[in-house]
């Protein structure tokens, strides 16, 4: 089995990639996917530490977080589709303008 440090390093790399995606991308879909990548990176770190400490409670928490993330994906994509149907764009710069 790989040491915990490898999993934590991979988690940090995935989180950094997700953060770069949030900060540099302009479409709502890519920002949404980057946030999900960051959430999965946090889950990976939590599972790695739980395995190192022999605690099963954290794995249960990760399962609950994954369930909530699935609901978040469904709601988030529905909102993005509704915005696209109304505005015909998912560019967040275009969505920032207030129109009555």
Swiss-Prot record:
Gene Ontology molecular functions: NADH:ubiquinone reductase (non-electrogenic) activity; quinone binding
Keywords tagged on the record: Cell membrane, Membrane, NAD, Quinone, Translocase, Transmembrane, Transmembrane helix, Transport
Catalyses which reaction(s): a quinone + NADH + 5 H(+)(in) = a quinol + NAD(+) + 4 H(+)(out)
Subcellular localization: Cell membrane
Membrane topology according to the record: Multi-pass membrane protein
InterPro entries registered for this protein in UniProt: NADH_UbQ_OxRdtase_chain4L/K, NUOK/Mnh_C1-like
GO biological process: ATP synthesis coupled electron transport
Enzyme Commission numbers on file: 7.1.1.-
GO cellular component, one term: NADH dehydrogenase complex
Signal sequence range: none
Annotated TM spans: 3-23, 29-49, 63-83
Assembly and interaction partners: NDH-1 is composed of 15 different subunits. Subunits NuoA, H, J, K, L, M, N constitute the membrane sector of the complex.
Record family assignment: Belongs to the complex I subunit 4L family.
Protein purpose: NDH-1 shuttles electrons from NADH, via FMN and iron-sulfur (Fe-S) centers, to quinones in the respiratory chain. The immediate electron acceptor for the enzyme in this species is believed to be a menaquinone. Couples the redox reaction to proton translocation (for every two electrons transferred, four hydrogen ions are translocated across the cytoplasmic membrane), and thus conserves the redox energy in a proton gradient.
Name under which the protein is recorded: NADH-quinone oxidoreductase subunit K
């Amino acid at each position: 089995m790989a040491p915990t440090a490898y999993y934590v390093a991979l988690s940090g790399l995935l989180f950094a990639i997700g953060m770069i995606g949030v900060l540099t991308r302009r479409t709502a879909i890519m920002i949404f996917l980057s946030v999900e990548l960051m959430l999965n990176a946090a889950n990976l770190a939590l599972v790695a530490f739980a395995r190192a400490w022999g605690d099963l409670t954290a794995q249960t928490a990760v399962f609950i977080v994954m369930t909530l993330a699935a609901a978040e994906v469904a709601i988030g994509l529905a909102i993005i589709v509704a915005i696209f149907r109304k505005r015909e764009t998912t560019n967040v710069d275009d969505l920032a303008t207030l129109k009555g």
